[in-house]
């Protein structure tokens, strides 16, 4: 964004200092919590506000959209990109007992219990309209779980998403499963135990191993729905 719009000032926030050090001169990172009542900025400060993949981050994402409306200039735009946590399938290759589907269901339960819901994507458009945005638009895209698709573009996206899911699976799981659902660590992550008889695994130890196998199974044609919603703050407020 900073490279494409060199005359703009780009401000980004996060809860911790994990941002790269090498960024365009017009890009600035701040440690801040968007759920705070005051963004420490004057009203109508921004021309454009963008959010992406914040499912599970806030108790009320609709309130974040309301805040975005408040801090936008009249005529400014806000855009949100969120994926539905529950995977979909169009050809019945994803059974009800598919391990990754079960994993997402447990994650949803934990997120609701923690008052940080994951299922927000399908509510974005309504929240935008309720906040006062006009000309609200929505597009829904398919993001394959892995590279199962015959379409080259979707295959590439799926391969990238599979890598992301596999690399982040343990981290995604630990907080929800251990702190919220009270699973023990060995119920969450597998550890191979060596013995004179070879490698042996117990049921509780193979949980994430099975999830990883499910994610990489090309025979299951599953995908996430990605909702992209944007809207304009009216030039004049009634």
Task: Give the ranges of each region predicted by the language model.
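Conserved catalytic/acceptor-binding region of the Class I
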Residues: 56, 62, 77-181
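Short glycine-centered segments of the SAM/dcSAM-binding site in methyltransferase folds
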Residues: 9, 76-77
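Class I SAM-dependent methyltransferase SAM/SAH-binding core
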Residues: 1-48, 62-66
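Eukaryotic intrinsically disordered and solvent-exposed regulatory patches
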Residues: 14-17, 34-36, 51, 66, ...
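Short SAM/SAH-binding signature in class I
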Residues: 44-53, 79
